[in-house]
Structures are given as C-alpha cells and as structure tokens.
Amino acid sequence: DMKLAEEMIAEASKSGADYCKFQTWKVKNLKDGPWNTDGRLEIYNKAELSDQNHSTLVSLCKKNNVKFLTSIFNINDLDFVSTLSNEAIKIPSHEVYNLELINASCEKFKKVFISVGACKWEEFKKILDLDIDLTKIYFMHCVSSYPLNVENVNFPKLLEIKKIHNQVGYSGHLKGV
C-alpha cells in the first residue's frame, strides 16, 4: 500500500529517524523454501514492490529528508537497488550466511547493515574474514521473533557483538514499538 508507505516515511522523518526501511524481493528470484507451500508465497506476491514503487519510495524519502534503506533477499536484486541509492543496504538475518551477497553489497553500498539474529559466533568470523572494507559493516542485534516480547530482547548480546566489531546496532520487532 503505497499510501501507507508515504505516511510511514513522513512519520519516520518527523520522529528524527535517519532511515526508513523497506524490503526488496522479486518472487521469481526467491530460492525455494517452506514459503512455497505454507501460504507465504501468496503474501510475497501481493507485497512485492515494483521497480516503479521502489523509485517512488526513494523520491518520497528524499522529499522527507530521510534515507531510503531496504532489506535485500537475493543477489539478483542488488544491482537494481544500487542504482536507486548506494547509501546503505540491509542483509536480513536469514541471509547472514550468504557471504556472496554480503561481499557484493560491500562493493556497491557505503554502509551494509547485517541483522545477526540467526548468526552463530563462527559466522561472525567468516564475515570478518571476507576481503571487504569492514568500516562499511554494521552488525545489528536482532532476535528473530515476531512480535518480540521485551523480556526476550537480550540486549547483553549487543555488548558481546561489540567486543568483536565496534559498529553495532539494534534491529528489532519489539511488540508495541
């Protein structure tokens, strides 16, 4: 719903947000998974943003002095998104193991936010060992639960993540926020 997106961008700007985040996927580019048969594929088809929708969102963000940010689910969509804005990209938790996507994102964007809700400590090492500019990487503590109750936020993990990489943040689905 583009009208709702426009309202959300305006509210994000009013609240002082730096970014307004969306999600980018093309259903035809999604890898196979449980969503093929559990009903989510129909939702993904309805919620897929067209190229024109993306361009409109970028323009609305600029108009409202907030930066456009999107989560990317497939390397095939990376080139298109980078033509709209090369400011930043977000790698969702379930793509944290996709080192090819992370590497390509670092080549095309100034900042790469990586949600690490599904990340094991060994995976942090693999990311940090990539031949990339680590100053572009921001690890975002995230608990992959929808919605998330406050007692499960686990903010101490944020401090643990900061011990291995100083640029950290929080990306959450906190109930009521």
State the predicted function of each range.
Residues 1-177:
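Catalytic cores and adjacent flexible loops of soluble metabolic enzymes
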